[in-house]
Curated annotation (Swiss-Prot):
It is a peripheral membrane protein. The keyword Membrane applies. The gene is Rgs1. Expressed in multiple tissues. Pfam families: RGS. Residues 24-38 have a biased composition (Basic and acidic residues). Keywords: Cell membrane, Cytoplasm, GTPase activation, Membrane, Signal transduction inhibitor. This is Regulator of G-protein signaling 1.
């Protein structure tokens, strides 16, 4: 009489607590996950790269806009001097920050960001000029720029030609146009703004205490 065959379960396929899948089975899901992760990764966009570049290029502007301690390192006399000229305002780092905050409220912060980028560019070492000039041009001057500045066609075209053989002065023409625009348009409004007047009044009140 033939003994009945006993069917034994395949342990490596059981979902039990003590046995895991075979090495071959355990490796396959990991490859699948890796493939899924690769598919989910998206290439960095130029816009994101440019934002990172702008933050690294003028970090004090962004940090200053968010700072709540400006009153601790400013005097009323210093802030009053900002009303003498745009030049005096921009010569002061905290002045740049406060003016930048005002421009941001008017959605025109690209003007001071470009001006600061040009100031930084002039201090650039010769072997780095080409790379930095290209970044500034693409960020502010190009017709599809992330933060396109308001300059005339001639200045835009002239700047485009100059960056092909970059020098420390290749953005000077465009920078002067933006400076004149801020001086004539934004700066007078800034001096009448709550951002400036409240800061000045608070500092003057603290002086009298």
């Amino acid at each position: 009489m033939r003994a009945a065959a006993i069917s034994m379960p395949r342990l490596n396929k059981m979902p039990g607590m003590f046995f895991s899948a075979s090495p071959k089975d355990s490796k396959e899901p990991s490859h699948s996950l890796l493939d899924d992760n690769k598919q989910k990764k998206r290439p960095k966009t130029f816009g994101m790269d440019m934002k990172a570049y702008l933050r690294s290029m003028i970090p004090h502007l962004e940090s200053g806009m968010k700072s709540s301690k400006s009153k601790d390192i400013l005097s009323a006399e210093e802030v009053m001097q900002w009303s003498q000229s745009l030049e005096k305002l921009l010569a002061n780092q905290m002045g740049q920050n406060v003016f930048g905050k005002f421009l941001k409220s008017e959605f025109s912060e690209e003007n001071i960001e470009f001006w600061l980028a040009c100031e930084d560019y002039k201090k650039t070492e010769t072997d780095l000029l080409h790379n930095k000039a290209e970044h500034i041009y693409k960020a502010f001057v190009h017709s599809d720029a992330v933060k396109q500045i308001n300059i005339d066609f001639h200045t835009r075209e002239s700047t485009a030609k100059k960056i092909k053989t970059p020098t420390p002065t290749c953005f000077d023409e465009a920078q002067k146009v933006i400076y004149a625009l801020m001086e004539k348009d934004s700066y007078p409004r800034f001096l009448k703004s709550n951002i400036y007047l409240n800061l000045l009044n608070d500092l003057q009140a603290n002086t009298l205490k």
